[in-house]
Amino acid sequence: MSWDQVWIDINIATMSPNISEPYGAIRDAALAVKDGKIAWIGKRCDLPEFDVLATPIYKGKNGWLTPGLIDAHTHLVFAGNRANEFELRLQGASYEEIARNGGGIISTVNACREADEAELFELGRQRLNALAKEGVTTVEIKSGYGLDIETELKILRVARELGKHHHVDVKTTFLGAHAIPPEYKNDSDAYVDLVINEMLPQVIAENLADAVDVFCENIAFSLAQTERVLTAAKNAGLDIKLHAEQLSNLGGSEMAAKLGAKSVDHIEYLDEDGVKALSESGTCATLLPGAFYFLRETQLPPIELLRQYKVPMVVASDYNPGSSPLCSSLLMLNMACTLMRLTPEEALAGMTRNAAKALGIEAEVGVLETGMTADFCLWNISTPAELSYTYGVGSCIEVVKNGRLVHQ
Ligand code: NIG
Ligand code: FE
């Protein structure tokens, strides 16, 4: 056998559904990499003979390998911050009131319109570094803090550039319909026209987005407006997804599922009909515990129904300055368990296998199996549940991306 690298003295949480052990675990395992892919994975005692003198061998000190983490929902390219709104909320103002009074998303829009690409890139790079340190190897980044053609394109270009210059892979999502900009305050339909007829074609022409998202909510876009944007995106061949049922139930998830959305995200107010629709269409349910925590929500997403209907649950950071200023994926694993009562195994599946599905990249990443991309992390832990049990101890000790060891 001729391999580029071999890992031994490891246990592996493959997260493969084809291995019946919890976490798809293989204890006393070995893994071999060739040309950026997993060439062999299994029990150490079954490892075929290979040229030990010509092959770099990495010893995992009996820690655990997991798939590289995938943060499938972030807004990490933005300028400014909203600490002032945090203070207002602690004095009693609600997230919705602040948004209705011209703060919220619009205040970040103002900061992004003023920032140049270099500034946004540097801010984004620092945030990507923070996620990468915790074992994230793929991230989704949304626009949505521009709300005019120039700034929406600027944010998406920066997101694409980050993907080119950082080892973390970046999937981009056009979220032009994130909020109604002040210029269209009294004519939101005209803004939706702009998103569909002018922004979307330019985003497509420059190949700036892999998917399209909308914020379907009383303080943002109606069900009918959301359907128009998602239909246009789908017709253009892009993946679709939705911020839905975060503060109320407008039926967005059900509609998006019927259009074949990859995921619906937040979904605190989703009901059983909605869950059924997700299960029928294979749409993922993305749980965002950071926003749930930071907005001090009390309405939990319908976790038990999602389990019952076997809807794949995704866990993501939703990193953004307003509702989840928490740039940590591992913290989300902990919160998914403590606040939303996922099992540690469900939480990890939400940041690996199911997150890959939500981004449409499940054929390449998200589980450790032969033929998959060699994106994985070595953790200094004695059981995979430790990933969501403890936080802040820096247990990610090595990251391999596309078969290359990344020095962090
Ligand atoms: O995912 N819900 C809408 N959008 C973001 C929040 C954006 C903001 O407040 O800046 C979210 O929570
Ligand atoms: Fe979000």
From Swiss-Prot:
State where 4-imidazolone-5-propanoate binds: R82, Y145, H178, Q246, S323
- Report the InterPro entries cross-referenced here: Amidohydro-rel, HutI, Metal-dep_hydrolase_composite, Metal_Hydrolase
Name its species: Shewanella piezotolerans (strain WP3 / JCM 13877)
Q: Per the record, a Pfam family?
A: Amidohydro_1
Q: What PANTHER family does this protein's entry cite?
A: IMIDAZOLONEPROPIONASE, IMIDAZOLONEPROPIONASE-RELATED
Q: Where are the bilayer-spanning segments?
A: none
* Protein name (record): Imidazolonepropionase
Which keywords accompany this UniProt record?
Cytoplasm, Histidine metabolism, Hydrolase, Iron, Metal-binding, Zinc
Places the protein is found = Cytoplasm
The residues listed in the UniProt record as binding Fe(3+), with positions renumbered to this chain, are: H73, H75, H243, D318
Top-level enzyme category: hydrolase
- Say which domain of life the source belongs to: Bacteria
Q: What is its EC number?
A: 3.5.2.7
Q: What's one GO BP annotation on this UniProt entry? A: L-histidine catabolic process to glutamate and formate
What does the entry's cofactor note say about binding and number? Binds 1 zinc or iron ion per subunit.
Q: Name one GO molecular function term.
A: zinc ion binding
- Family annotation (CDD domains): Imidazolone-5PH (cd01296)
- Residues in a coiled coil are none
- Give the residues the record marks as binding N-formimidoyl-L-glutamate: Y145, N320, G322
